[in-house]
Amino acid sequence: MDEPTQSGAGADTRRWWHGTVGYQVYIRSFADSNGDGIGDLIGIHDRLDYLADLGVDFVWVTPFYPSPMADWGYDVADYCNVDPRFGTLDDFDTLVTAARQRGLRILVDLVPNHSSDAHPWFRDALTGPDSDHRDYYIWAAPGPDGGPPNNWVGYFGGPAWTLDEASGQYYMHLFLPEQPDLNWRNPAVVEEFDRILRFWLDRGVGGFRIDVAGALVKDDLLRSNPQIGPWDPTADRYEQWLAFDHLHDVFQPESHDVFRRWRAICDEYDAYLLGETYHQDPQGLADLVPGDGMHGGFWFAPMHIDWEVDKLRRVLAGPIDLVGERLLWAAGSHDVPRSPTRFGGGDLGRERTLVLNVLFSCLPGVPVLYQGEELGLVDGRVPEEAVLDPVDNGRDGCRTPMPWAPGSGNGFTSGEAWLRSEQRADNETAHAQVGEPDSWHSRYAGLLAALGTLPDLVYEPLVWTDGGYGPVIAYRRG
């Protein structure tokens, strides 16, 4: 048997989020309170007892800001308000207060890499090169051939540049053209977001999940990325992205200056600052969440692997020495097929997902459940004619409405859901599972209850061991 090996980066001073479990709410699909088919803040409020009884500690809510919804809310037109489809600021304040009364904290999704093209800043920027907000965004003259300024491609495919015909300049967008990237080398943008953070912190939020955290600052010279493979503009968006070594459009070290600044602000409020740190390399993740920056970052590799023990162990062990308690673990999200679907479907996929969440819960860091994971949900079935995702049809299945009860609408809405999908089976609903000893919900609730009785899982180092036989992942804490 191999000698045990100890693992885990040095611990931060203990904060409220150590030893907690998070829960992601995709607001459009969680609970609709008014029958318009769209989940809303009051709907979340009305389900707080469910979340508290499940045993989670904080709730990350996806964007609810005013938005044209080109990318379902990740195109923000006003960072300090609530879209009427989701409610009002008063509804938000009520949600935060009610959550605190139940021992829950609300984390909001902050989208700082880009705004909507409908944001007043960008509207003003379009009025001309001398406008007050022109430098809030990234503009450049055409390249020598009259086309885009460089070879950057967007994550959703195609060039990362769109021509503003009125001025003859291009603006940069890492995602959709409706999502122009903000210029984080402009101190005015930095100051705007200081105010935005304080606006929500003063309303009592428990912290922020930073969208696209690794991409804020771009190369100041706008240099082209090295091309490492053939680029075909008609290819799959991932193939287009992987044709380049992204040295200049993402992961610039100056982003850390922003995160250190936000860390100081959040520390004033004892708020949790975590990032969507999309990096497949453990060292790359560690570089995104150094000890003096964001309090934590998601490790996404488990969302992109098959169920194979050696590979799974490597993925789990890889970042622990480097990142330790700053890790956030998740089996699913609103951007990937649900893990039971990925891991074989049916009860096999559900069992594997539960095992993965048990592993996450026993490792350094913070596990986060995606809504419905506790019910063992596989991807919902969306008829071809009802597909809505403008970017990737594979995301609709994980975004179908939460099934609260049997029958039409599955208790999500009294109207027609924004995303049409097949009705869930009765035994997939929360109504059928809560309180049933052998249900998936009861298994997850039991896991979370057990975590509260095992302080070694928070305070003791991790020791990897040889399982002694077969394909086994083995370790101990304490």
Task: Locate the predicted segments by residue.
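Generic enzyme active-site microenvironment
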Residues: L107-V108, R209, L274, A330, ...
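Acidic/aromatic-lined carbohydrate-recognition and catalytic surfaces
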Residues: D2-R198, D202, A215-Q280, M402
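Flexible loop/turn segments at secondary-structure boundaries
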Residues: S67-P68, H114-S116, P159-A160, R209, ...
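Substrate-binding cleft/loops of secretory-pathway carbohydrate-active enzymes
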Residues: S116-L126, D267, Y272-W307, L377-D389
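Loop/helix patches that line or flank the sugar-binding groove of alpha-linked glycan CAZymes
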Residues: E3, W16-H18, L221, P226-H248, ...
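Glycoside hydrolase catalytic-domain groove-lining segments
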Residues: D236, V309-R326
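Hydrophobic residues within beta-strands of alpha/beta enzymes
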Residues: V59, F208-I210
